[in-house]
């Protein structure tokens, strides 16, 4: 469960190291974001010569949470850290060209198929 002020790792090579959620998109009083939800983030730590810099405000899709996701068969998939993939504000396509770490099957769909195809492992 990601809410405002939550810190996440960037799971791509966009140049951001850590980001902070500043808004959960999708409803006026929506409080929490789960895997597959789009959030608004600001870059808190970035590497030199990256595509994004500290202070940039971007959209991101949540790909891993400590809370996890429950499958219809009753199993739960949890991760050690919260992580997201940064998106272009206009096209909502990933900024980076590589994805680090596993992503879940819940991301499969029309919007995030590119992220699933770039990921090294889909759980």
From Swiss-Prot:
Annotated Gene3D superfamilies: Ribosomal protein L14
CDD domains assigned to the protein according to its UniProt record, in alphabetical order: Ribosomal_uL14
GO biological process, one term: translation
Quaternary structure note: Part of the 50S ribosomal subunit. Forms a cluster with proteins L3 and L19. In the 70S ribosome, L14 and L19 interact and together make contacts with the 16S rRNA in bridges B5 and B8.
Record protein name field: Large ribosomal subunit protein uL14
Keyword set includes Transmembrane helix: no
Cross-referenced SMART domains: Ribosomal_L14 (SM01374)
Naturally occurring in which organism (per UniProt): Vibrio vulnificus (strain YJ016)
